[in-house]
Amino acid sequence: MHQQPRGPARVSSPGATTQPNLPSRSNSTREAALGSRPRAGSNLVGRDVPNSPSLESPPIPAPPADSVRKLDQIIQNFYAKAAVLVLDSRIKSRPARGANGARKPNKWFQIETDEIDDFRDELKIWKNCGSLDNRPPPMVIEVYLDASRLKDSQSLVIVDENGKRWDVMEQLNSYGSSTDSSGASRRNNEVVIERWQVELKHSGMTSVDFGPILPTVYKKAIVFFRSLFITTRLLPAWKFASQGAAKNSHPALIPRCRIRLSQPDRPRYDQLRLPIDGRPDPVTEYVFGDLEVPVGRLSTLVTYRSDCNFRVDDSEALLSSRFMGVDENFFRPSLPQQHATSRAPAAEAGSLRDHRSKPNLNDIQQAYGSLSTFHGNVPIGTSPISALRSVRQPGSDTSSPPESIPAQHDVGGPSSLPVRQGTARPHLPALEGLGRRPSVSFQPFKAGSLSGSPVPRQLDAEPASPQSLTRPGIPSLRQAGNRTSLTAGMPASLRGGPPTSSGETAVAGSPRPASTSRYSSSFTHRRGRLSFGGASKAGDDEQGSSGRQSLASSVAQPGSGLLAEVAGTSSESLRDDNEQLEDFIKALDSKKTLQSFGPSKTGESATNKTVAQLSRFHMMRDSNNALTESMTSSVQMQRSSSSSSRQLTSVPGMTAPASVSASSSPGKPLSPHTPHTPAIPSRLSENSIIDYSGQGRITSRQGRTSDNTQPGTIRENTITQDGTTAIDIPLSPRLATYQRRASSVAIQNRSMADDDDTDSAFAHRSISLGADDREPPTLSILLGRQMQLEEDSTQRPSDRLEPAADTGSTETPDMLRQGLSEENPPEGLIPAATSSSPFGRRRYMGMASHKQTPPQSSRGSFNGSLNRQVRGDDDSVNEEPLVFDLSEMDPQGRRSIEEARSGASGGPNIGPDRGGYESRNASRRGW
């Protein structure tokens, strides 16, 4: 029974269906034995008959002709538009013109272009193709350079990314002669730089009607051509063609185009894919997205050269440069050579031989951080300086502990100049890591941070000889991570240097500069540099552990002589000879080291210098204290005669007389920032000061003793007493402020009234403000004081305050104290509104014209500091000549006032004056 399905499988085979006796075989004796199975066999035969190729299937209905015509137009214009976009971006095409001479625009796919005449015959193939019957072939557009127009003395060259020139024709012909099977050798004069390919890939018959999806196909084609237009302007050939047209360059550098029907006949000899600049993969391919059409897919591909830096050079110059070896190995990248068994002895790059121990790469200690945050495989508690002594750069000229770096391999120090690659380099070990090209750089900081990337150290082989004619190249691979950020950030004086000669020795120790030679005998003229070696002295460990370096080692500037290993640690320079290195060293020596950064001749460290400076300032403190005590004693001595009678019991003092500080001005808030100009009495001028006090106070003291017991003269006595020491106007201290009180009686008396209030608030007067340094009284002052005493003895006590203050006010001491308690300005600051003296009126008007509304500063407040930012009467204070004129004229004006006052009573004069003063207090409170 298992043979039952095998019979129908044999019948349904294609070979069996072609035989004419199929029905007789289905009714054989085997089917009779099966019983009910003959129907199944007949069903299988009847089922396979329609599928037989001998029988015609019913024809599929053809799509509408209108849909086919629209699809043909889309495909035809797709090829034409793609060709126009590519050709117009690479060459100067000639637009096609109509009968009237106008251009023929093409607005298909929403990109307006012009019909061109250059490739009209070639494009006819795709303009007459169809989607179903006359299917289009692939269209290939090549952009190339024609070198046949070059002269015999000219060569088409390409400059690679490293600056080396390559002869393009020589490279192409060398590949062509080796791969050409024919015996005839022909010279190639074309360089293909770009190839475009557009192809319709069929997928079979379509459905009955595809007309409804054609608008969608057209919209997708719009997006495709926008992408194509942008891509043609981004490829290297577009830039090369644009520059050639703008510069009117050589005809061999003008791109040309051609259209082909297929790929080149010989695929092994593809001129586009042949390398011409030494790179293994010279071309790049870009595939656009396929455009789905009802009959298949429209695909577009572009293959272009990645480098199009072509130019025309002289053949003789190119040949000469090749003989000189200038273009050989110019910045040739060094690739990793995986030969772990290579143990060739490595020497530090340079012209000096190596005679040092070879440290093992695996034993190099990793350390990073700064002097304050040092991390490394060192015992806990080790200071950064101590760790630096043990963690030395392999290859430095200072000895290291034998247990820190075993001697097996040599590792070059960090390079500070461009590195030249030697002509003969052994294979490097496999454990090397990729490194970067060192550059000329100077670290601006004393130590690197944790964020600084470690600079790898370089493993160099035999040093290149000075007679090498190779161009400097990228240095070989170096060990990644061995250069710590701490070593990278430190100045050159803390890092290792070039190898020393066999006769040179150096000691490892504290960061004390050592006068060790940094170069061999060829450079003995170079003076010694600061290094991280030398004998230890007292104070060095303290300096290193605190994170501070010496002045000479912490500042490393170019040309200062501290970067001693710049020339010694470079592998190879651009001109690899000893003369250039010697010139560079001389250039470093030509710049003089700054005196503050240079090494000390006596070897004194920065710590000792700092201690010496601090000691000098410490010694100055004693003289400063002695001067302060002298100032304090002079203040107390001058105030001893008048301090007992200056206190007003009604207003408590802000500062007691006994609390005079030696560091602040007496009579001011004890603040070190209080601005004042101290008038320090000198021993040379003590006699003159005594003369001033004797001449300037004799009159006022006589007046005080004569009327000391009268109750009506309490205010006058206080004013006369305070006039010798108090401030006339509580302004910022000035050198010439005291002249206002020594000029005239009017100004002096007004200042006496002011000083009474000021002194009652501060309880004493500062000697630094010129309290006793008064000018000798003039004859006019003595005459005015004599007249004042005579008038005081003849008038009633109620009128005695008017000529003294020159304001016409008759306030009593009780009213004065009341005004002080309300923080009103003193009477001497603002003259009365109806002053009896016309000159005093002039002074008030000048102040009012300067500023109508007085500023609210601290000058009128007796609870704050006397320092103020804004003063309303700066002009009146600075007008010193006007004050002197008023002082000289006040006695005559006062005599005229007294003559007019002798015939009238004092009552009418008292009321207006007092009223004017009270209104002024109301409007100028707190000033």
UniProtKB/Swiss-Prot annotation:
Cellular-component GO terms for this entry: Atg1/ULK1 kinase complex; cytosol; phagophore assembly site
Biased composition (Low complexity): 630-671
Pfam families associated with the record: ATG13
Region called Disordered, residue ranges: 1-66, 334-359, 388-559, 628-716, 786-927
Signal peptide coordinates: none
Domain of life: Eukaryota
Mutant phenotype after disruption: Does not significantly decrease the growth rate under nutrient-rich conditions. Strongly reduces conidiation. Causes only mild infection in point-inoculated spikelets of flowering wheat heads and impairs the spreading to nearby spikelets. Also reduces strongly the production of deoxynivalenol (DON), an important virulence determinant.
Sequence ranges of Basic and acidic residues compositional bias: 793-803, 891-901
Entries under Gene3D superfamilies matching the protein: 6.10.140.1900, HORMA domain
Subunit structure: Hypophosphorylated form interacts with ATG1 to form the ATG1-ATG13 kinase complex. The ATG1-ATG13 complex interacts with the ATG17-ATG29-ATG31 complex through direct interaction with ATG17.
Task of the protein: Activates the ATG1 kinase in a nutritional condition dependent manner through the TOR pathway, leading to autophagy. Involved in ATG9 and ATG23 cycling through the pre-autophagosomal structure. Also involved in cytoplasm to vacuole transport (Cvt) and more specifically in Cvt vesicle formation. Seems to play a role in the switching machinery regulating the conversion between the Cvt pathway and autophagy. Finally, ATG13 is also required for glycogen storage during stationary phase. Autophagy is required for proper vegetative growth, asexual/sexual reproduction, and full virulence.
Family in the record: Belongs to the ATG13 family. Fungi subfamily.
Protein's recorded name: Autophagy-related protein 13
Species of provenance: Gibberella zeae (strain ATCC MYA-4620 / CBS 123657 / FGSC 9075 / NRRL 31084 / PH-1)
Origin organism lineage: Eukaryota, Fungi, Dikarya, Ascomycota, Pezizomycotina
